[in-house]
Amino acid sequence: MILLNLMLYFCSMQTTSTEIKKKCIRSLSAEELKDFFVASGEKAFRSRQVYEWLWKRSARSFEQMTNLSKETRTLLENNFSINPVTISQKQVSTDGTIKFGFKLHDGYLVEGVLIPADDRMTACISSQVGCSLTCKFCATGYMDRKRNLEPYEIYDQVVLIKEAAEEHYQTPLTNIVLMGMGEPLLNYTNVLKGIDKVTSEEGLHIASKRITLSTAGIAKMITKLGDEKVKFRLALSLHAANDVKRNTIMPINETNNLNVLKESLLHFCKETGSSVTFEYIVFDGVNDTAQDAKELYAFAKNIPCKINIIEYNPIQEADFMNTSVDKLEQFKKVLTDKGIIVNIRRSRGKDIDAACGQLAIKEVK
């Protein structure tokens, strides 16, 4: 009876109507895929073959699954879609950075970036189509959020950027940062599932410590990351250690103020044993004074951390200005003199709008 019900369930996916979409096969667990094959009268081991094609071998069509019979491939084609992410646009910066426009199965576009460096090859990927937050310095913040990305769409971005790294630089991908379009912690479940596939042996088997999730600061979700003892790195997009200033730059601070954020970060560090990275864009006349640096030290001093000071990358929608090199160095010195680890991060891909804060694809659908 169970097998009959399963068969009826999966057969119900078949339709001649163009109005009903096929279920994406990559939304099934390994066990659900096995159940489908058994209910269809196929050998259970076929599910393992297909699962390997879908994840480890990143098949983009059922026709690529050459160790399956034509009948089995037709069965899959009639019941499922794969919904692969494809590259619709590509731009190469003078510094070697490559920006991608990724097209999703429903026509929406998101952006990702390959950032080459002497000691690493980094993929910057998106977690949402658009963003519901309204950070004033970020181009994505001026777009509406259309939808969350599915786990397989997060995974596919990594696969495509990994292939580009090998093609253009003959170098493997070493790092992944979720710093593209969207707020990852507002797509919590799908992002963690996507990371799980990227790190698993059945997927790309990339070490968790090579992955960094960047958030604007959703305190309760940072606490949840700590509770789940995640293995990947966490970065907080901070940009001011003063609630009044941060409210202006990042309105999310009005509901996730600095005290609440500090509490959640301390919990995260305690539960995971990891440090965090604070990202701090220095804007001329806004947050670049010695007093701002002292406030940043006061916020960070009891949290295991390092601080990345970032050059501002101009966008059309905002009138912020980059601070001077002298002010940048003075700001850094205030922190390093107090024992804080500080890096100044130079912009990459600015000439193709691929730098931090510049991702906002011109054509959304």
Curated annotation (Swiss-Prot):
Disulfide bonds: C124-C356
Binding sites annotated in the UniProt record for S-adenosyl-L-methionine: G182, E183, S214, S237, L238, H239, N313
Domain Radical SAM core: 117-351
One of the GO biological process terms: rRNA base methylation
Cofactor(s) in the UniProt record: [4Fe-4S] cluster
Keyword Metal-binding: yes
Ligand binding ([4Fe-4S] cluster): C131, C135, C138
CDD domains: Radical_SAM
Location within or outside the cell: Cytoplasm
SUPFAM superfamilies: Radical SAM enzymes
E.C. number(s) listed in UniProt: 2.1.1.192
GO molecular function annotation: 4 iron, 4 sulfur cluster binding; metal ion binding; rRNA (adenine(2503)-C2-)-methyltransferase activity; rRNA binding; tRNA (adenine(37)-C2)-methyltransferase activity; tRNA binding
Catalytic activity: adenosine(2503) in 23S rRNA + 2 reduced [2Fe-2S]-[ferredoxin] + 2 S-adenosyl-L-methionine = 2-methyladenosine(2503) in 23S rRNA + 5'-deoxyadenosine + L-methionine + 2 oxidized [2Fe-2S]-[ferredoxin] + S-adenosyl-L-homocysteine; adenosine(37) in tRNA + 2 reduced [2Fe-2S]-[ferredoxin] + 2 S-adenosyl-L-methionine = 2-methyladenosine(37) in tRNA + 5'-deoxyadenosine + L-methionine + 2 oxidized [2Fe-2S]-[ferredoxin] + S-adenosyl-L-homocysteine
Any Pfam family hit: RlmN_N
List of catalytic residues: E111 (proton acceptor), C356 (s-methylcysteine intermediate)
Principal location listed in the UniProt entry: cytoplasm
Mitochondrion listed as a keyword: no
Cofactor note: Binds 1 [4Fe-4S] cluster. The cluster is coordinated with 3 cysteines and an exchangeable S-adenosyl-L-methionine.
Note: Reaction proceeds by a ping-pong mechanism involving intermediate methylation of a conserved cysteine residue.
PANTHER family in the record: 23S RRNA METHYLTRANSFERASE (PTHR30544), RADICAL SAM CORE DOMAIN-CONTAINING PROTEIN (PTHR30544:SF5)
Family classification: Belongs to the radical SAM superfamily. RlmN family.
Function: Specifically methylates position 2 of adenine 2503 in 23S rRNA and position 2 of adenine 37 in tRNAs.
Name assigned to this protein: Probable dual-specificity RNA methyltransferase RlmN
Organism: Cytophaga hutchinsonii (strain ATCC 33406 / DSM 1761 / CIP 103989 / NBRC 15051 / NCIMB 9469 / D465)
Gene designation per UniProt: rlmN
